[in-house]
Amino acid sequence: MSSPKEPLSVVVAGGGTAGHIEPALAVAEALRDGYGATVTALGTARGLETSLVPDRGFDLRLIEPVPVPRTPNLDLVKLPFRVAKSLRQARQVLRDTGAHAVVGFGGYVSAPAYLAARSLGIPFFVHEANARAGMANKLGVRLGGVGLNATENSGMPGQVVGIPIRRELAGGEDATAAERGRTQWGLEADRPTVLVTGGSQGSVSINSAVAGALDDLLGAGIQVLHAVGKRNSLPTARPGYVPVPFIEDMQAAYAVADLIVCRSGAMTVAEVTASGIPAIYVPLPHGNGEQALNASAVIAAGAAKLVDDADLTPQRLVSEVRDIVGNPATLHRMSAAARTSTVGDAAGVIAGLVATAAGY
């Protein structure tokens, strides 16, 4: 009899923001649940992964981040030394875990992970969630990684697989999650609810617009669940207005929301669309313009609207929200458009590709 194989071991790399971490964890769960894999997450001490990864039951190993300066400065001079240190750390993690494969999702830890995997002869995959690929992921494919894209024309070679999202967010309406949300945030079931979030750090422009629009929104019978960001001061709660620093239970938040106002990071767009929630996207006005592109397909499908950051005044916010929430037919049409534009099980597809490449 042949001896049984050792369990599949995979390292996922995608630290920093939730947009990098959540797809990594979705794939980690698909590998664990579908293939019995041991999955280790690679991250840094400064990212959200320090809480998100352990909370989801995975081991987290830390390395030094390697941000690439966009302009010549002292950090650029230090870059080769930082890369060398992070590469050594990443190689050690791959050896310690006996990794059979690596999957990177962009961010500061991905480049060292790609370099380490190549140097050790370990197959590796590069997932790009944004409509425009980042530098670390482009490097990963050039190094021999298998490219996996969320959308066409990202500028990175590879097949289109969509964005991995948590299974519990892909099932649409969830009465249990909605009741949990109403209980923990004190929301009323018979009032329309607008969820507002600027991401884990919050958004000054979105927060300011909400502050100026609040009287009109509440006066129209709309209740607002507002994640202001961990670093921002918490506004005073009012009847119908629930400000919180950050929302851990996004399943419940999506379940109670009739409409969401948020940035259009790739992961956010994927989760919101899968949850069937009409959206008003306010793209981050920085970077290479990928946030506007991330939302372009769902906007074209009629599932969302876009408001430029510079145009987000309190008056514009009130107008857009009331146009959607105040019209049940519009809400229904946008929700249906969101559900029909959702991509399939990207996490399962990626897990299958990884397991096959590793010989499992």
Swiss-Prot record:
Pathway: Cell wall biogenesis; peptidoglycan biosynthesis
GO molecular function, one term: UDP-N-acetyl-D-glucosamine:N-acetylmuramoyl-L-alanyl-D-glutamyl-meso-2,6-diaminopimelyl-D-alanyl-D-alanine-diphosphoundecaprenol 4-beta-N-acetylglucosaminlytransferase activity
Primary subcellular site in the record, as a coarse category: membrane
This protein's GO CC annotations: plasma membrane
Subcellular location: Cell membrane
Listed EC numbers: 2.4.1.227
Keyword field contains Membrane: yes
Full protein name: UDP-N-acetylglucosamine--N-acetylmuramyl-(pentapeptide) pyrophosphoryl-undecaprenol N-acetylglucosamine transferase
Organism name: Corynebacterium efficiens (strain DSM 44549 / YS-314 / AJ 12310 / JCM 11189 / NBRC 100395)
